[in-house]
């Protein structure tokens, strides 16, 4: 029988999942397998549904897995980019902070130097001629030891010196938010500086003691 005759006689049938309708006569059916008819079989809908469901579930799981991996990689890449940006911002912040801190320290040293010189000149009644660099280095030592930030600083002076001090150091006191406190126990030619972190005694007795100590230690 030629292929042409077969193609005309037979109709192609592609069952997805088939079973015998009459399983009790399966031996008889198998013996006469040459006489199979389409009616002898049926599609197992239940198994077919289970197979379809299983296939769909696998496809869904695979899709979810791919979506998760894609999302994870995307999130990881975005996180790395944001982390890099954050590091750059922090580096810039710390760099600016260090520069500002150094600038503030220099300005504070300069202001303290001027303050000490003016107060010293007022105490002895004439302009003093000293090595400013030595005094500046000493002030820097105090700042490095005690810290550049004075919290709630107070300038303690004798009441009779209040007007004079306010006139001379008004700009400095206002810009650094210092508070003037009057105390009758402070000598006319002295003062004290107090804050939450440090106390500086600049009375005449304290300055003489400090001067003697510096001479003995040969710091000058």
From Swiss-Prot:
UniProt keyword annotations, A-Z: Bacterial flagellum biogenesis, Bacterial flagellum protein export, Cytoplasm, Protein transport, Transport
Highest taxon above the source species: Bacteria
Keyword Transport on entry: yes
Annotated Gene Ontology cellular component terms: bacterial-type flagellum; cytosol
Alphabetized Pfam families for the sequence: FliH
GO molecular function terms noted in the UniProt entry: cytoskeletal motor activity
GO terms under biological process: bacterial-type flagellum organization; bacterial-type flagellum-dependent cell motility; protein transport
InterPro entries hit by this protein: Flag_FliH, Flagellar_FliH/T3SS_HrpE, T3SS_Stator/FliH
Compartments in which it is found: Cytoplasm
Recorded family membership: Belongs to the FliH family.
PANTHER family, per database record: FLAGELLAR ASSEMBLY PROTEIN FLIH, YOP PROTEINS TRANSLOCATION PROTEIN L
Entry function: Needed for flagellar regrowth and assembly.
Name this polypeptide is given: Flagellar assembly protein FliH
Species annotation: Buchnera aphidicola subsp. Acyrthosiphon pisum (strain APS) (Acyrthosiphon pisum symbiotic bacterium)
